[in-house]
């Protein structure tokens, strides 16, 4: 017996149970990736994208493709250790992602070890430099989402730098 799935346009597709499960996983992964590539992701919220995200691992992520220039991005800062680029689905007038160029086991902040001390400091200092470069003298916010409950959707440590408007509290 088949199951009906809906594609991104809402059309029904009949599939076997196994095929339906595989298609559902594929759609979830596609939605997670598209949330960082498209201003109109398949999933409506970051929470849904985070819950659908693959568990943390050392497998390549969308950020690895950006680091390797396989996917275009608008880079605002780069050195030998860190890359900063504009988020393609900004949540503020200025929304920049700051990432280590080498993941080194840092799929999220909760995975940090003492050996990551230097890169963690470098990421925060880079956030300060980029904020100044972007003219955020009045203030800015940095955010690190960690794990599914923290709405992390890409398992490569990254800092969101948000600014250009009055932020609200509490944030989430």
Task: Give the location of each predicted region.
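HIT superfamily nucleotide-processing domains
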Residues: 2-172
């Amino acid at each position: 017996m088949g199951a009906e799935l809906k594609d991104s346009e809402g059309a029904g597709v009949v599939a076997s149970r196994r095929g339906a499960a595989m298609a559902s996983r594929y759609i979830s992964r596609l939605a997670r990736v598209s949330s960082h590539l498209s201003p109109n992701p398949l999933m409506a919220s970051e929470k849904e994208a985070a819950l659908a995200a693959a568990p943390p691992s050392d497998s390549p992520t969308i950020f690895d493709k950006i680091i390797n220039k396989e996917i275009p991005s608008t880079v605002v800062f780069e050195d030998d250790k860190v890359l900063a680029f504009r988020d393609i689905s900004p949540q503020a007038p200025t929304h920049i992602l700051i990432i280590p160029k080498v993941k080194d086991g840092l799929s999220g902040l909760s995975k940090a070890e003492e050996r990551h001390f230097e890169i963690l400091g470098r990421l925060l200092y880079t956030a300060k430099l980029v904020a100044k470069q972007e003219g955020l003298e009045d203030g800015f916010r940095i955010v690190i989402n960690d794990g599914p409950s923290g709405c992390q959707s890409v398992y490569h440590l990254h800092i969101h730098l948000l600014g250009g408007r009055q932020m609200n509290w509490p944030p989430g």
